[in-house]
A protein has these predicted regions:
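Short Gly/Pro-enriched turn/cap motifs at secondary-structure boundaries
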Residues: 187-190, 216-219, 236, 262-269
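Flavin-dependent oxidoreductase catalytic core characteristic
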Residues: 3-148, 157-158, 163-164, 171, ...
Length: 642
């Protein structure tokens, strides 16, 4: 399994960079974090081993983390409710400078920066709770703070920066300097092998000359410091490759060409940035040449946890809005929440909101503990939270009917409470695209999920491996599968007494245990059936990952309910697990009984233009500009000239 590969092997026709499919896959593979030095609940789950001991007892924050975090949240809540008008941000599509300054004065720019470097030193848990709080007030504020800290300069510096870099940059970043992360280009999204931006060594290697255009630079319009990914050409003394640089956003040659506008998150400072021979000192490279993509991917292992936090917050807000409206609105003689059609939606929102918070809190606490490798758990959390929160918001809009489609401003203008259901729907939509689209996330997780299989049997299915190496792989595979496969037949999930301490939740944990083994068996069947072609069965792999995500959420919901110890929490966990199990069972059916092949064939006919007759009778107001602007011809007004 590699990321990504198109079914059928058709190579993209339009190339702005002469990069083969194989080269793209190789770059993605060498940029992976290959070591598994700590246990992983997610990895074990996909292998059919339900390691409840890795998440139960549910981890808890330290007293110091709680004291520091609760005090910070209290100040943040007071600031938001007293000093920030979310309607102003939504109306003007901009966070006022006074608000940004107030956030900086409060310490919000350094929430997850260590106190050693002037930050607030919040744990992952309380950093997530702070983002949830700000995101529930207005999404643009949470986006500003998370883009600055979760993927901006502070996070890669935390893991890969030198001590000198940390002492130089982290204090101002924790105080009043805003950062941004720049990877995407007009023709480069999930395939960084096509990157055009270059950093050419100059001055005998003492500096680099950075040139290129970066797109969708969240915070880039107002940022002071940037972490930029650029390709260093291979030359004598330079290994080359995609590398990470800290760049002064005000340096000569840095130009913000355009401030982008989106369907949601109004107020986001996202733009297009051009670099024209910008000098970057060698000491401002993070890590070594060629390590940039690896740094970016490993940074996201924990950086991705910001999105589950804001998605969980949105789901919780949707529950409040749905509950209040379903109790207030009366149709056919009773509140609409008493009609089964609406009651089912309320139940879905309630169960999902509980599960999303459980996933977010457990993932964050596991990151704080540093006892487990959470790359799979964090990726599953991001994928699951973004998909489910969107469905929750859609159901809220449906429950509120016409008022769900009406803006908060319009509702207030005619004397009703400004419940911005349509706003949360618009704001959440990008979560399925931000920091790895759901489709790419499924492929990334699938690659990690089958890592054990590839390590023991990869040479058996690889096309260019010599026979002696295949023979060795066959021996390894026989030894591994001879022990592994029999263990997938029976387990604790078949014993009625298993997990008895969980009471009413025990049947659901037994289901997770049984189903994890079933998931592992089906993954193996897919590998046996398609072998090297499995990487092209993206729909199959996507369903495998979706099943794993549901099992992860069920596990988190159960251990959280057990920790909380209330009947209410137990009720919601049972509710959610029942809903999730039905989705899982359907996904298993779809693994082997589907229309994947016929749908793929039809899509190729669509691409070939065979069905263009369907497009007749409509007008296209989009104009005739290119669908993708070339990197050397990026247009737009100059927001901040270089």
């Amino acid at each position: 399994v590699s990321v990504p590969a198109a079914p059928g092997g058709q190579q993209e026709v339009r190339h702005m960079a002469a990069v083969s499919e194989q080269q793209s896959r190789q770059l993605a593979e060498v940029s992976r974090q290959t070591e598994w030095e700590k246990p992983s609940f997610g990895k074990e789950l996909f292998l059919g081993r339900f390691r409840l001991d890795l998440i139960y007892p549910h981890p808890v924050p330290t007293d110091a983390d709680s004291e520091r975090g609760e005090a910070f949240l209290a100040k943040l809540e007071a600031f938001l409710t007293e000093q920030v008008d979310p309607a102003e941000i939504e109306r003007d599509a901009k966070i006022p400078e006074r608000v940004i300054k107030g956030l900086a004065d409060l310490g919000c720019l350094g929430m997850n920066i260590s106190e050693d470097y002037g930050g607030a030193g919040l744990s992952h848990l309380y950093y997530g709770r702070a983002l949830a709080l700000t995101g529930s007030w207005h999404s643009a504020i949470a986006t500003l703070l998370s883009a600055h800290q979760s993927i901006g300069v502070p996070e890669p510096l935390r893991w890969f920066g030198s001590e000198e870099q940390k002492r130089k940059y982290l204090p101002p970043l924790a105080s009043n300097k805003i950062s941004a992360f720049l990877l995407t280009e007009p023709d480069v999204g999930s395939d960084p092998a096509r990157m055009h931006a270059t950093a050419v060594p100059v001055e005998n290697g003492a500096a680099y000359e950075l040139s290129g255009v970066k797109l969708w630079t969240t915070n880039g319009v107002i940022a002071d410091l940037l972490v930029v990914m650029a390709d260093v050409p291979r030359s004598e003394g330079h290994r080359g490759g995609i590398s990470a640089f800290i760049v002064d956003a005000h340096a000569p040659g840095v130009t913000v060409l355009h401030r982008n506008k989106f369907m949601g998150i109004r107020g986001i400072e996202n733009g297009v940035t051009r670099f024209d021979k910008v000098r970057v000192p060698r000491e401002d490279m993070i890590g070594d040449e060629g390590r940039g993509l690896k740094i970016a991917l490993q940074t996201l292992n924990t950086g991705r946890l910001s999105l589950p936090a804001t998605c969980a917050a949105s789901a919780k807000w949707c529950l409040k809005a749905a509950r209040e409206w379903a109790a207030e609105r009366v149709q056919w003689g009773q509140p609409i929440g008493r009609h089964e059609a609406v009651a089912k939606k309320l139940a879905f929102i309630a169960g999902t909101a509980f599960a999303l918070e459980a996933v977010m809190e457990l993932s964050s606490l596991m990151a704080d503990e540093e006892r487990n490798d959470i790359r799979i758990e964090a990726a599953l959390a991001k994928l699951y939270a973004s998909e489910m929160a969107w469905k929750v918001a859609d159901e809220l809009v449906q429950i509120r009917g016409g008022r769900g489609f009406e803006t908060a401003e319009s509702l207030e203008a005619r004397g009703e409470r400004g419940v911005g259901a349509e706003q949360v729907l618009r704001d959440l939509r990008i979560s399925r695209i931000f920091e790895g689209s759901s489709e790419i996330m499924r492929l990334f997780i699938a690659r990690e999920a089958v890592d054990q299989h590839l390590s023991v049997a990869g040479d058996l299915i690889a096309p260019n491996v010599e026979l002696p190496d295949k023979a060795k792989a066959a021996g390894r595979a026989a030894g591994f599968y001879g022990k592994w496969l029999p263990r997938l037949a029976v387990g604790a999930g078949h014993l009625p007494s298993s997990f008895a301490e969980f009471g009413p939740l025990a049947p659901h944990l037994r289901y997770v245990e049984r189903t994890s083994r079933k998931l592992a068996r089906n993954t193996f069947y897919g590998m046996a059936r398609w072998q090297g072609g499995l990487e092209r069965r993206q729909a199959f792999l996507g369903r495998i990952v979706d099943i794993g995500a549901e099992l992860w959420a069920m596990s988190a919901a159960c251990v959280r309910a057990k920790m909380l110890g209330t009947d209410e929490a137990g009720d919601l966990a049972v509710l959610f697990c029942g809903q999730a199990a039905r989705r899982v069972d359907q996904s298993f059916r779809d693994l082997w009984h589907n229309d994947d092949a016929s749908e793929y064939a039809a899509a190729q006919q669509v691409l070939a233009g065979r069905y263009e007759f369907i497009e007749a009778g409509v007008l296209d107001p989009s104009g005739d500009l290119p669908l993708i602007a070339s990197s050397d011809a990026a247009a737009g007004e100059e927001i901040r000239p270089g």
